[in-house]
């Protein structure tokens, strides 16, 4: 019966055979790859584009993230691209003509120590300076925003306050991917699933196409948007990326009536919690410490995040875990992304988003499309070049990442 519904994803875009050549080939059919294709078509009139996905569309990190959207980052460069992304989020449901349930319910980032308080107040002032909505809340005000949180002083790390971004929130991740895919397909973009890139065609230090499990595809330009497998793709192309891949786990509970009205994050005790539209509690924590490409992780990470969640939200002690899963996040040494040209001519890369990839989806697509179309970075992504790891102009956002990297 579900196959007959008009919103079933098979009816939203075509599944063509790959052509022999394209102006642009985008490797990675997740949110970032699809957003890039959409903005190439919309903003730059480039529609002879193929998005190649090795599995099913948006079946990687796009299907596995915890859907949090915010822009309250510390440094000017980060605030710029994430705030641009948030503004795009606010207009995309109408622009894409698709309701992906973007809910601006606000995000609380908790402070548990005097050090947390000082850093949080600093972050609020920096956000205001950059035009990002931000407030500092006392524990009592935190309780007003989220009535079920425990602000007592009898827990391991008492809540001493929180930063609050009212415009932040969550969205339905699958629907976001489908919305971008549908609109890009309408504009002439080919979306090709079950097509894994196995190598690159090169003429000296210039990329001219890709080798795939469905044949060779020639391309004027190639963009990499493979998230956790970006370093593997870069190695195939003949250069190295300064990233490491780690598993990142999440879990959901059984369904409940609405009890959790906002998003709560705690870097100090490594847990973040929201309630999805259907009613399940969605929780995440820090990355697993080891490197790997497995979409699973160690149980102790789940165990520790559940203990932290129950301490902050005693009511959750009665909840049952429905399922857990993992994604593969690509992290840089400064916890900031790479949206850049590469040492290979006509090859571009978007990676290194770590745990912040979903919230950056529109901004990543917008800036990468500009970089591809003009062969030079947009002002928003110029600071996120590969060269910063040589010059030392790093953008250290470990504190804003909300979980341990």
Curated annotation (Swiss-Prot):
- Functional summary from the UniProt entry: In the presence of tetrahydrofolate, catalyzes the oxidative demethylation of sarcosine to yield glycine, 5,10-methylenetetrahydrofolate and hydrogen peroxide. In the absence of tetrahydrofolate, catalyzes the oxidative demethylation of sarcosine to yield glycine, formaldehyde and hydrogen peroxide.
In the UniProt record, does the keyword Oxidoreductase occur? yes
Q: What is its main location?
A: cytoplasm
Reaction catalysis annotation: sarcosine + (6S)-5,6,7,8-tetrahydrofolate + O2 = (6R)-5,10-methylene-5,6,7,8-tetrahydrofolate + glycine + H2O2; sarcosine + O2 + H2O = formaldehyde + glycine + H2O2
Q: What else is noted?
A: Utilization of tetrahydrofolate is probably the physiological reaction since the products are substrates for serine hydroxymethyltransferase, an enzyme which is part of the sarcosine oxidase operon.
Compartment(s) of residence: Cytoplasm
Q: Which GO terms describe its cellular component?
A: cytoplasm
Quick one: effect of changing residue 195 to S?
A: No change in activity
Lineage at the top is: Bacteria, Bacillati, Actinomycetota, Actinomycetes, Mycobacteriales
Q: Which InterPro entries match?
A: FAD-dep_OxRdtase, FAD/NAD-bd_sf, Rhodanese-like_dom, SoxB
GO terms, biological process: tetrahydrofolate metabolic process
Q: Which family does it belong to?
A: Belongs to the SoxB family.
| Effect seen on changing residue 175 to A | No effect on FMN binding and activity
Keywords on record: Cytoplasm, FAD, Flavoprotein, FMN, Nucleotide-binding, Oxidoreductase
According to the record, cofactor stoichiometry and binding are noted as: Binds 1 FAD per subunit. Binds 1 FMN covalently. The covalent flavin was originally thought to be FAD.
Per UniProt, FAD binds at 31-32, 53, 61-62, 66, 68, 197, 354, 357, 359
Q: How does it assemble?
A: Heterotetramer composed of subunits alpha (SoxA), beta (SoxB), gamma (SoxG) and delta (SoxD). May bind to both the delta subunit and the alpha-gamma complex and thereby stabilizes the association of the delta subunit with the alpha-gamma complex.
Task: Write the gene name.
Answer: soxB
Q: What is this protein called?
A: Sarcosine oxidase subunit beta
Q: Which PANTHER family match?
A: FAD-DEPENDENT OXIDOREDUCTASE DOMAIN-CONTAINING PROTEIN 1 (PTHR13847:SF287), SARCOSINE DEHYDROGENASE-RELATED (PTHR13847)
Q: Which cofactor does it need?
A: FAD; FMN
Question: Which residues are recorded with the post-translational modification Tele-8alpha-FMN histidine?
Answer: 173
Organism of provenance: Corynebacterium sp. (strain P-1)
Q: Which GO terms describe its molecular function?
A: nucleotide binding; sarcosine oxidase activity
